[in-house]
Amino acid sequence: MNIELALTLVSLVLVVSAGPLVVVLLSARGGNL
């Protein structure tokens, strides 16, 4: 397994998992304000 391929997969997983988290955090902050 290439290191570049592994880094690409990890970055994809981070982006996919961070997307909804950012949306939830922003909506939570907006709701609190």
From Swiss-Prot:
Gene deletion effect: About 15% decrease in O(2) evolution, no visible change in PSII protein profile under moderate light (50 umol photons/m(2)/s), increased sensitivity to photoinhibition under high light (1000 umol photons/m(2)/s).
Protein keywords: Chloroplast, Membrane, Photosynthesis, Photosystem II, Plastid, Thylakoid, Transmembrane, Transmembrane helix
Superkingdom as given in the UniProt entry: Eukaryota
GO cellular component, as recorded: chloroplast thylakoid membrane; photosystem II
Repeat recorded as keyword: no
Location in or out of the cell: Plastid, Chloroplast thylakoid membrane
Biological-process GO terms, alphabetical: photosynthesis
Stored InterPro entries: PSII_Ycf12_core-subunit
UniProt topology in membrane: Single-pass membrane protein
UniProt KW Membrane keyword: yes
Transmembrane portions of the chain: 5-25
Family the UniProt entry places it in: Belongs to the Psb30/Ycf12 family.
Job of this protein: A core subunit of photosystem II (PSII), required for optimal photosynthesis, probably helps stabilize the reaction center.
HAMAP family, per the entry: PSII_Psb30_Ycf12 (MF_01329)
Assembly, per entry: PSII is composed of 1 copy each of membrane proteins PsbA, PsbB, PsbC, PsbD, PsbE, PsbF, PsbH, PsbI, PsbJ, PsbK, PsbL, PsbM, PsbT, PsbX, PsbY, PsbZ, Psb30/Ycf12, peripheral proteins of the oxygen-evolving complex and a large number of cofactors. It forms dimeric complexes.
Name under which the protein is recorded: Photosystem II reaction center protein Psb30
Organism for this UniProt entry: Chlamydomonas reinhardtii
The organism's taxonomic lineage, starting at the top: Eukaryota, Viridiplantae, Chlorophyta, core chlorophytes, Chlorophyceae
Gene (UniProt): psb30
